[in-house]
């Protein structure tokens, strides 16, 4: 087999991504244990089943989630929503997740399979109606429940649950499909009162990513006590500014889910919407979520660039976000970025067809568009359009240098207000087609 230079370069980037973005250690919240196993659902024998359990009994846990708005909601999405609605987010003590099969568009039998996964874990932890379920993989196939059931039992019966770094990294690996690296982030924060707490998050995703009021597959857990109503608002706010601001290919999955559990293992007052620390926690969770969401884009299927689309000075935040999303989802913009072509006309085109809530957010006579270098090289900003006027003397050599960077920024200044929004996206390469052309095989 003749290996092309392009293929060799792609392999090098995959290795670099793993070494760059996968941690070698972490700090993890009190009162949780996680376990994972290769149940046999994945043909390659990789980890494909994971369980997270809250072991803290000092106070009841709380949970929140944000789900896909795709009309073909998968069985695990519908089942988890039902659990959260019936419990009002209180007393959720476990998450069970599988990869390799999405259990989507599988009818009533798929619903029964999702419920069976929940029931198996509930029985093992001795707490009814206490588990959420998540699945990812190929759509339209039923779960191999003989393997899933045996795998869940093995995790519990063989004492495969732990709170060490390897256990957390492995459960992050267990939700991967076309991912080239597991997404695991952990961090310790300090509140205004000096109390410290820990947050850990995992996500999977490299393709079928353009969430809307939800996001791919991921979960956060913390040892901070947070009331369920406050937790839902914190997670929604954070998601709207992180996972709802990423795009790889413009496709929204049937299974997109982000959930968060707060077990209150840290001895401090419960965070409510009226707490002095509420806004601080909301900000900390949001910045944490951005870090994790950006890892998904950095692992975009076949991608070679990480691109920040920064829309400034809009009349409203919503319109800034709509414009940033329109640019990020444009196939023509993404392919131009891959080809290192400074085709600013495609950017303006994507801005022009954005479905704005307030048309006054866009004034074609005042808009400016630039490429921004992120490697501290000068000139850092290369103006393409200024006050609605194309810059006919654009330095093509400098444009090529910026577009050759692994990280770069597209800056749009609307000059119609004071609101801003960011989206994170990647380019679209030949490799993306190769990966998705034979995904089921």
UniProtKB/Swiss-Prot annotation:
Substrate binds at residues 177, 204, 215, 301, 436, 441. GO terms for molecular function: glutamate N-acetyltransferase activity; L-glutamate N-acetyltransferase activity. The alpha and beta chains are autoproteolytically processed from a single precursor protein within the mitochondrion. The record marks 214-215 as: Cleavage. The active site is at 215 (nucleophile). GO terms for biological process: L-arginine biosynthetic process; ornithine biosynthetic process. One of its GO terms (cellular component) is mitochondrial matrix. Pathway: Amino-acid biosynthesis; L-arginine biosynthesis; L-ornithine and N-acetyl-L-glutamate from L-glutamate and N(2)-acetyl-L-ornithine (cyclic): step 1/1; Amino-acid biosynthesis; L-arginine biosynthesis; N(2)-acetyl-L-ornithine from L-glutamate: step 1/4. Keywords: Acyltransferase, Amino-acid biosynthesis, Arginine biosynthesis, Autocatalytic cleavage, Mitochondrion, Multifunctional enzyme, Transferase. Gene3D superfamilies: arginine biosynthesis bifunctional protein suprefamily (3.30.2330.10), ArgJ beta chain, C-terminal domain (3.10.20.340), L-amino peptidase D-ALA esterase/amidase (3.60.70.12). It comes from the Eukaryota. It catalyses: N(2)-acetyl-L-ornithine + L-glutamate = N-acetyl-L-glutamate + L-ornithine; L-glutamate + acetyl-CoA = N-acetyl-L-glutamate + CoA + H(+). The record marks 136-137 as: Involved in the stabilization of negative charge on the oxyanion by the formation of the oxyanion hole. InterPro entries: Arg_biosynth_ArgJ (IPR002813), ArgJ-like_dom_sf (IPR016117), ArgJ_beta_C (IPR042195). It is found in: Mitochondrion matrix. This protein may be expected to contain an N-terminal transit peptide but none has been predicted. NCBIfam families: ArgJ (TIGR00120), PRK05388.1 (NF003802). Catalyzes two activities which are involved in the cyclic version of arginine biosynthesis: the synthesis of acetylglutamate from glutamate and acetyl-CoA, and of ornithine by transacetylation between acetylornithine and glutamate. This is Arginine biosynthesis bifunctional protein ArgJ, mitochondrial. It comes from Candida glabrata (strain ATCC 2001 / BCRC 20586 / JCM 3761 / NBRC 0622 / NRRL Y-65 / CBS 138) (Yeast).
